[in-house]
Amino acid sequence: IGLIKKSDKGKYYDKYRNRIIFPIINHYGNVIGFGGRSIDDQMPKYLNSPESDIFKKRYNLYGLNVYKRQKNKDIVLVEGYMDVIALNNHGIDYAVASLGTALTLDQAKLIKRYADNVYICYDRDSAGIKATDKAVEIFLNIGIVAKVIVLEDGLDPDEFIKKYGKEKFLEKKGEALDSYNYKYNKILDIYSKANQNEKFEKLDLFIEFLSSIDKELTREIFINNVSTLFSIDKSTLNEAINKYSTDTGNKDKFNYSKKANITIVPS
């Protein structure tokens, strides 16, 4: 399980020196590995046991053994051990960590077995945002519309709840955006920052997004939004979406606004 490591010179040393060590317990209650968080500037920040027959990171979640004892059907997905512990210490006893920033499909399926409502609360640095985007897509692919909690001041969950407390965290949880609104707002932000000549080009991002929505009613809501934003007739927009869906997989999968002969009059 990787507590001791052999150096290039053949000597053995403590792999987790200068780190806080956390036992990793699977959902059956068995210790299967260890994680270490650096207490200084040592990189990487988090270090896990190596992959083995008993420890496979992609199949496990830190804190799931505790979560299983709760009756709460919400689950908050965070990055690290300290986030889980801090949230638990403040009464949020339904947090689990993905043992790093990258959620795997197997971890998502494990969450689906136990939770009805999934909240993603990763750090808001570039790596955390990228991991959030990936997690949103993974959950959507298995039929879960997760919600994304965005914490202010760039704080991670550990720092945030220690500074603002449980009620403020729950307030942020209540404001969490579902996956579709989260994705839409990200594209809307890109659109709003584009100059007038570039705005038309951003329509393809909206078309790609709209084509990814399976639920007809949900898609219709966002079609109305995009139709209003670009002053496009909904039937024309639907034509572009259908062309995108038909041609997905081809290299030339963008510029569907042009293929659908959409014309936008700048406002």
What are these regions (language model features)?
Residues 1-114, 118, 131-132:
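Phosphate-handling DNA/RNA-contact segment within nucleic-acid enzymes
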